[in-house]
Amino acid sequence: MSDSQTLVVKLGTSVLTGGSRRLNRAHIVELVRQCAQLHAAGHRIVIVTSGAIAAGREHLGYPELPATIASKQLLAAVGQSRLIQLWEQLFSIYGIHVGQMLLTRADMEDRERFLNARDTLRALLDNNIVPVINENDAVATAEIKVGDNDNLSALAAILAGADKLLLLTDQKGLYTADPRRNPQAELIKDVYGIDDALRAIAGDSVSGLGTGGMSTKLQAADVACRAGIDTIIAAGSKPGVIGDVMEGISVGTLFHAQATPLENRKRWIFGAPPAGEITVDEGATAAILERGSSLLPKGIKSVTGNFSRGEVIRICNLEGRDIAHGVSRYNSDALRRIAGHHSQEIDAILGYEYGPVAVHRDDMITR
């Protein structure tokens, strides 16, 4: 076994249930055994788990509930405790303690809360405790949800300072086409950079019963790889898959980490779910992508959403393509007022100014 590494393992609903309506406990037992074996060898393991709603539905005897957010949150509230009890029970067989962390998008958007979550997660790891992470589905609304556990796992990998992120699913990896519809589809074993062609392939693929399909796994891989974290998509049903990944054995699709990873602050900017969105003109797009310039108010065409100064926002071109994420120097209302104006007009329009740029290049990361 190699020197100690930190591995984040994301377990989707399709892996935990085997495609059924209930948790597949026999399979979860095997996954815990693999993790415990690595833990005993000195590796640090983080679990990102789905399955709270499935656990709640099973515990309540599959009640007939309306298809509403309130119903899902009811099931999550019941299932969350059942789920953590299951992880606790199974890891205790090996003398391993677990610690639960429930996160929402707000924990990632706010830099101080992000750092606090990081410190908590690393304290658990430093004390040989296995963190079990899930989104706080019992209280999270659409506005504060990360949205899927694929992207949550990438953020967890950044928080943990992980070496590898393993996304376990019901497929062997990323294929050249959806293997369920195209028998000629081939497994892509290595990816050295994510481009629009790969995104198009992932957009046509599906992955099990959960919130995230292959497209969200690609998003997660992009975030993690740019933070210097190797990411693997593999089948959760493959025997010994977790150990194989830690040994460097070829499994599924390996997304190779960026050779020069982002600095810590830019990892947060890149990984934080955007609080809003602005659309910029062709001149601003070229300045950002080709010259690495800051974004000036003059180049802003429209502002979407309500956000505060200091929050991370998405920057899109006129075609709607996501070209960058950055920390806004002004809130959404102020940006709407100064959009299309020259920087020297800011003070006259607002009665104050926080500098001539809307998003500074030091607070921006291109996609």
UniProtKB/Swiss-Prot annotation:
EC numbers for this chain: 2.7.2.11
Quick one: a GO cellular component term? cytosol
Quote the PROSITE patterns the UniProt record gives.
GLUTAMATE_5_KINASE, PUA
Residues at which ATP binds: 10, 169-170, 211-217
Per its UniProt entry, what is the enzyme's top EC class, as one word? transferase
One Gene Ontology BP term is: L-proline biosynthetic process
Q: Does the keyword Ribonucleoprotein apply?
A: no
The segment(s) forming the PUA domain are: 275-353
Task: Tell me where on the tree of life, at the top rank, the source sits.
Answer: Bacteria
Which SMART domains does this UniProt record tie to the protein?
A: PUA
Q: Which UniProt keywords apply?
A: Amino-acid biosynthesis, ATP-binding, Cytoplasm, Kinase, Nucleotide-binding, Proline biosynthesis, Transferase
What GO MF terms are annotated? Answer: ATP binding; glutamate 5-kinase activity; RNA binding
| Residues that bind substrate | 50, 137, 149
Task: Name the reaction it catalyses.
Answer: L-glutamate + ATP = L-glutamyl 5-phosphate + ADP
Pathway as given in its UniProt record: Amino-acid biosynthesis; L-proline biosynthesis; L-glutamate 5-semialdehyde from L-glutamate: step 1/2
Location in the cell: Cytoplasm
Which PANTHER family is this protein grouped with? Answer: GLUTAMATE 5-KINASE, ISOPENTENYL PHOSPHATE KINASE
Identify its protein family.
Belongs to the glutamate 5-kinase family.
Please give the function described in this protein's UniProt entry. Answer: Catalyzes the transfer of a phosphate group to glutamate to form L-glutamate 5-phosphate.
How is this protein named in the record? Glutamate 5-kinase
Organism for this UniProt entry: Shigella flexneri
